[in-house]
Amino acid sequence: MKKKTTLSEEDQALFRQLMAGTRKIKQDTIVHRPQRKKISEVPVKRLIQEQADASHYFSDEFQPLLNTEGPVKYVRPDVSHFEAKKLRRGDYSPELFLDLHGLTQLQAKQELGALIAACRREHVFCACVMHGHGKHILKQQTPLWLAQHPHVMAFHQAPKEYGGDAALLVLIEVEEWLPPELP
């Protein structure tokens, strides 16, 4: 451990003289986010329940009408179409990534449900879902499942840096977070 260096009396007096007439600045420009809970702090039973609740929305029988021409995209009716444009341009950078490679459809649904629940719990607005190319099963099903979930605001085929046509950028509706009151 290093020794603490102390200032001489002369240096301390000089410092006090230079600082005379100054006042402490009140910090009011940075709003601190609440610390995120680690996933390990959330009870396992709650995680399993959230995952089951979220995957409840994914049906294989219901086929939402999605545009089949061009890149895969979807915007919920109450959300601005500019959000899809922002996703396409890469204005949103995903904070959570989900890789569905090698999963069955059932496992993929459960993982999608867990991702959406985690995004809402952690206040994450944008996530990336990598479905891959493979046999095109997950590539075709993933957009259909996401379009059914009420907390998915929009999704768009990811830009090249996030996986291109083998991935989707997803906007998740999170509960409104208000900054803490400043004293």
Swiss-Prot record:
The record's annotation in SUPFAM superfamilies points to:
SMR domain-like
Q: Which GO terms describe its biological process?
A: rescue of stalled ribosome
Q: Where is the Smr domain?
A: 98-173
Q: Which domain of life is it from?
A: Bacteria
Q: Activity regulation here?
A: Correct positioning in stalled/collided ribosomes is probably required for activation.
Q: Which InterPro entries match?
A: Smr_dom (IPR002625), Smr_dom_sf (IPR036063), SmrB-like (IPR022990)
Question: Which Pfam family name is an example for this entry?
Answer: Smr
What GO molecular functions are on record for this protein? RNA endonuclease activity; rRNA binding
What does this chain do? Answer: Acts as a ribosome collision sensor. Detects stalled/collided disomes (pairs of ribosomes where the leading ribosome is stalled and a second ribosome has collided with it) and endonucleolytically cleaves mRNA at the 5' boundary of the stalled ribosome. Stalled/collided disomes form a new interface (primarily via the 30S subunits) that binds SmrB. Cleaved mRNA becomes available for tmRNA ligation, leading to ribosomal subunit dissociation and rescue of stalled ribosomes.
Q: What is known of its domains?
A: Has a probably flexible N-terminal domain and a conserved C-terminal SMR domain; the N-terminal domain is required for ribosome binding via uS2.
In Swiss-Prot or TrEMBL terms, this protein is called Ribosome rescue factor SmrB
